[in-house]
């Protein structure tokens, strides 16, 4: 009998699939259920699903989940929404669709009236941003498994772990004590934060499930916390900012704060920077020096050519009668070197006799050798309004001419006779340069100029150069500021969260917690957490359903019928001085502290009076 083949391994839920499911469900069932902020998504480039409207979601949660307590019916109603329906259609297999429905049911169950917790936020960790948290709305006994607080575990491969180290955005990675492998857990249980003295612990259920069990009594309004590990926030959790560390002034809440980083290595030396900058400026300002081109003979200004493309150089060796065309001569190339060399030689020999150097003075391309150049005589070279007189050299025939597009004019006879120099290496100089205002080639050098009347070169008077004094300046450096030491309670009643003029801290009339109300022209009664609870369940927080037969309070089915602001007489008792900011911080809010919200002195004497006092004054005026 042939052995039976091994059973095929069932497909497992991957990390990418679970992260996508969790982003879709939290966007639909948390962010669009009267939530005052956005839950962090696993994918950084997540876009909200279209076709999911907040009114439709909250209506399904109220009628199907809270009142009817039918999770299956609510699941079907939610999947009929256009946004979720289109997403389910994109899933390839039936198994993937079942995984998504299973994950959706976990989030639907947290809205059941018997659920002992709810999703809220806290700004204890970052002050300016709110992180998700879990708050108990029912008393939880020690050893009880917190109902509906579960999650899904997925093992992380080494490749995925490397990617998550760079892109992960929250603390959803746990180390399994049984498998000794890192795993990502998502679901409602992911919102439980860390505490060094937690009131609950994570327990695995099956191969892919996770639950949270209370290890001590959890009272109403207390945050549900677990332990992430001993070294999760640094060595011995030295950077932990949990509530226990806040009360004990330890770890991240220690008065000393984090150590400051030494910034001397990142700060450049001032003198070295100045020397580099001065040397760089000198290199830019001064021309390059060479043995054949002294620095004092170089022109002070760089000549500019308007028609530089029309200027060409043709070089032919003495043995061949036909000239060979060469590339264009640039301003910094042959012509400038030729003019500079003539000026230096003319200065040494007083424009009468000078000897040609044996070294070449025109730099050609890297592939060709350097060669001596000469200009044609006056009667052979055509001129134009853009050209100057040329200088001829007997060793080689070098012509500077313009393109036919330039208008040419007959050249006038030269007033000065050409100067000749005898010798094998002698040079015949016919004309040094002519005065032409339209061309910058008329400049011999910085030390010579042309006499207009005699048409001769005259040495210029030396010009005194002003030495610029080097100014010492402070070099600004970009350094990262060391994180400031945290103080207990610095995230409550702080001015850092009052961005607008009318923002202020307000005391909740239900849970006695301080919250920031934006544009607080009228003071709200409840904080966002209590107001959201009232809109969803129709009762005041933390009540979710009738408490026995004798409870006659009716559930409010339409939240729009509830007035969410203080009454006139209650508003009159509120002091607006200080905008609710407290300078003496404490880890727990002081309930007995007077509610001081907006400084009335900023708006004048007229706004110091509340509306009730204005009405009383107007009634007195009418009576009189």
Curated annotation (Swiss-Prot):
Domain SET: 115-229
EC number: 2.1.1.372
Protein's cellular compartments: Nucleus; Chromosome
UniProt superkingdom: Eukaryota
Protein source organism: Coccidioides immitis (strain RS)
Enzyme class: transferase
Classification of source organism: Eukaryota, Fungi, Dikarya, Ascomycota, Pezizomycotina
Annotated stretches, region: Disordered: 253-302, 362-425, 459-490, 573-609
Family statement: Belongs to the class V-like SAM-binding methyltransferase superfamily. Histone-lysine methyltransferase family. Suvar4-20 subfamily.
Biased composition regions of type Low complexity, renumbered to the chain: 363-374, 383-396
SMART domains assigned to the protein according to its UniProt record, in alphabetical order: SET (SM00317)
PROSITE patterns cross-referenced by the UniProt entry: SAM_MT43_SUVAR420_1, SET
The protein's name: Histone-lysine N-methyltransferase SET9
Biological processes, Gene Ontology terms: methylation
Gene: SET9
Disulfide bonds: none
């Amino acid at each position: 009998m042939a052995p039976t083949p091994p059973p095929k391994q069932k497909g497992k839920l991957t990390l990418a699939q679970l992260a996508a499911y969790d982003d879709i469900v939290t966007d639909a069932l948390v962010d669009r259920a009267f939530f005052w902020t956005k839950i962090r998504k696993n994918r950084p480039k997540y876009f909200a699903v279209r076709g999911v409207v907040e009114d439709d979601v909250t209506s399904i949660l109220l009628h199907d989940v809270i009142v009817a307590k039918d999770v299956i019916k609510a699941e079907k109603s939610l999947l009929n929404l256009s946004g979720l329906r289109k997403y389910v259609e994109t899933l390839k297999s039936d198994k993937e669709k079942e995984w998504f429905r299973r994950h959706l049911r976990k989030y639907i169950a947290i809205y059941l009236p018997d659920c002992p917790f709810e999703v809220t936020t806290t700004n204890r960790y970052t002050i300016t941003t709110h992180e998700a948290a879990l708050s108990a709305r029912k008393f939880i006994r020690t050893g009880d498994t917190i109902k509906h607080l579960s999650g899904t575990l997925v093992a992380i491969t080494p490749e995925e772990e490397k990617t998550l180290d760079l892109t992960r955005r929250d603390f959803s990675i746990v180390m399994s004590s049984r498998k000794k492998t890192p795993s990502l857990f998502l679901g409602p249980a992911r919102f439980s934060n860390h505490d060094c003295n937690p009131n609950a612990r994570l327990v695995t259920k099956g191969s892919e499930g996770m639950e949270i069990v209370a290890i001590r009594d959890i009272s109403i309004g207390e945050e549900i916390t677990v332990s992430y590990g001993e070294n999760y926030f640094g060595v011995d959790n030295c950077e932990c900012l949990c509530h226990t560390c806040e009360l004990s002034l330890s770890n991240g809440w220690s008065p000393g704060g984090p150590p400051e980083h030494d910034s001397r290595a990142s700060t450049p030396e001032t003198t070295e920077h100045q020397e580099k900058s001065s040397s760089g400026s000198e290199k830019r300002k001064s021309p390059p020096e060479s043995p054949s081109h002294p620095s004092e003979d170089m022109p002070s200004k760089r000549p500019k050519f308007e028609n530089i493309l029309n200027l060409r150089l043709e070089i032919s060796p003495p043995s061949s009668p036909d000239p060979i065309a060469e590339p264009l001569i640039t301003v910094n190339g042959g012509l400038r070197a030729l003019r500079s060399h003539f000026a230096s030689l003319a200065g040494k020999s007083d424009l009468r006799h000078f000897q040609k150097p044996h070294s070449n003075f025109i730099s050609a391309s890297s592939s060709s050798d350097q060669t001596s150049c000469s200009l044609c005589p006056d009667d052979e070279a055509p001129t134009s309004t853009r050209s100057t007189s040329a200088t001829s050299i007997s060793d080689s025939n070098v012509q500077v001419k313009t393109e036919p597009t330039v208008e040419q004019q007959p050249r006038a006879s030269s007033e000065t006779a050409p100067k000749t120099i005898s010798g094998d290496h002698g040079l015949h100089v016919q004309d040094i340069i002519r005065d032409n205002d339209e061309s910058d080639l008329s400049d011999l050098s910085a030390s010579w100029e042309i006499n207009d009347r005699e048409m001769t070169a005259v040495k210029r008077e030396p010009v005194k150069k002003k030495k610029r004094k080097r100014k010492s300046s402070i070099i600004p450096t970009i350094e990262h500021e060391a994180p400031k030491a945290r103080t207990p309670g610095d995230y409550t009643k702080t001015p850092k969260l009052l961005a607008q003029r009318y923002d202020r801290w307000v005391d909740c009339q239900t849970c006695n917690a301080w919250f920031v109300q934006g544009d607080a022209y009228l003071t709200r009664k409840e904080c966002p957490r209590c107001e959201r609870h009232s809109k969803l369940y129709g009762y005041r927080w933390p009540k979710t359903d009738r408490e026995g037969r004798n409870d006659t309070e009716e559930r409010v089915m339409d939240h729009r019928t509830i007035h969410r602001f203080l009454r006139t007489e209650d508003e009159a008792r509120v002091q607006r001085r200080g905008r609710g900011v407290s300078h003496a911080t404490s880890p727990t809010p002081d309930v007995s502290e007077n509610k001081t919200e907006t400084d009335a002195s900023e708006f004048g004497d007229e706004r110091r009076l509340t509306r009730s006092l204005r009405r009383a004054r107007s009634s007195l005026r009418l009576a009189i």
